[in-house]
Amino acid sequence: MLPIIVLIGRTNVGKSTLFNILSKTRNALVADYPGLTRDRNYGYCYLKENKKITIVDTAGINFKSQKIEKQSHEQTLKAIKECDGILFLVNARDGVMPEEYEISRKIRKYEKKTILVINKIDGIKEISKINEFYSLGFKENIKISASHNQGINNLISKYLTPWINSKFKEKKLEKISQEHSKKEKNSVKIACIGKPNVGKSTLINSLLMKKRMITSNKAGTTLDTVLVPIKYNYKNYIFIDTAGMSKKKSKTNKIEKFCKIKTLQTIEKSHLTLLIIDAKDQISKQDLLLSSFIEKSGKPLIIVINKCDLLSLKEKKNLENLIKKQLKCNFFSKIHFISALNNEGTVELFKSIDTSYHTSQKKIKTSQVMKIMHKAVKKHQPPIINGRRIKLKYAHLGNSNPIEIMIHGNQVKNLSLCYKKYLKNFFYKTLKMNGTPIKIQFKETMNPYISKK
């Protein structure tokens, strides 16, 4: 296992900003808004080219009694228990706050290596304000400005690297890092998307068989995208929990806008997508828009109807027929009825995930593509335009993931949408794509008998 460093501190001290800089990603949502991070968010920091450590972004520690804050607090404590070291972040502009003495006491109970990171030092002229933090009693401390990338190299080279080298043998860590990178590369990435409160986080907890994600009846509990590795039947998967896609448009809510953008980016980066629908709400306009975006992204789609324990067999059948009717223009492999809370029907998901993933990765030969095109044309010829029949000459694979087929011919720009759809469906059924969308591009071939001027 890679060494684990956890980022701890109050809300809005810059943990997510530092997490993004150390991991060289934008995985953690950052805004001037307290309580944005709720679940543990894992990333990787490379100390050298072949040597990396795990870093964990956590929710800001506060001592409120609300349910979500309590669950966030529990997640942070779990991160401290499993880690090898702690970066305790404080805000230089605020000075020492009373909660930070309480946080210090909690950290010391676990007897973990701790480095005090005094963040947001840019523009601070009062040295006495920074010196206040020494009263927290940590021997090792460093001053940085995460948002200005100031002091980050010192943090890595003078603090993290020497400590990791003293605790872990270099060659062993390099080997672990390489094995981990290989495992991550071979993992199937699955985006879990849907409206707020449909049970995305509950589903991941059910598959993992432990409470990894924060859940509640309150819509919008998950704000960030969170990657959760799961091993099942000796295979590695990464499930990505996302913020619920709400149909409400709020001009003032920038957080909601950022969440939507990150969810759409997650779909594009994943191998396949689970569209989760609440059995009580049935399928909505928002679900249809999401399924359309998934198809345009070229990702396999699996429909998951959650909370199906509330439906009778007849209601399930009616809902299944309704979804098939509403999504008749979209490609999806299967409709799964589950109850994530009761762990019913969740194991069957892995079979569909494996089938859809392997289908999307299949290699298609040019000869096979040509053969299918000729079969399609023989069965239903292209239309005649201006006295001449549109001629499809040859076809080949343009891209493999997402699958894109290039068809060359004469007058292909005049092909009707109806005929294009016919070709698309013909290729889809013949290749047995099983929920994986196909893109078809048409290219006009040059007539060699027309002289070039």
UniProtKB/Swiss-Prot annotation:
UniProt-listed GO biological process terms: ribosome biogenesis
Superkingdom: Bacteria
UniProt keywords, alphabetically: GTP-binding, Nucleotide-binding, Repeat, Ribosome biogenesis
UniProt: GTP 1 binding residues: 9-16, 57-61, 119-122
Subunit structure: Associates with the 50S ribosomal subunit.
Record family assignment: Belongs to the TRAFAC class TrmE-Era-EngA-EngB-Septin-like GTPase superfamily. EngA (Der) GTPase family.
Protein name: GTPase Der
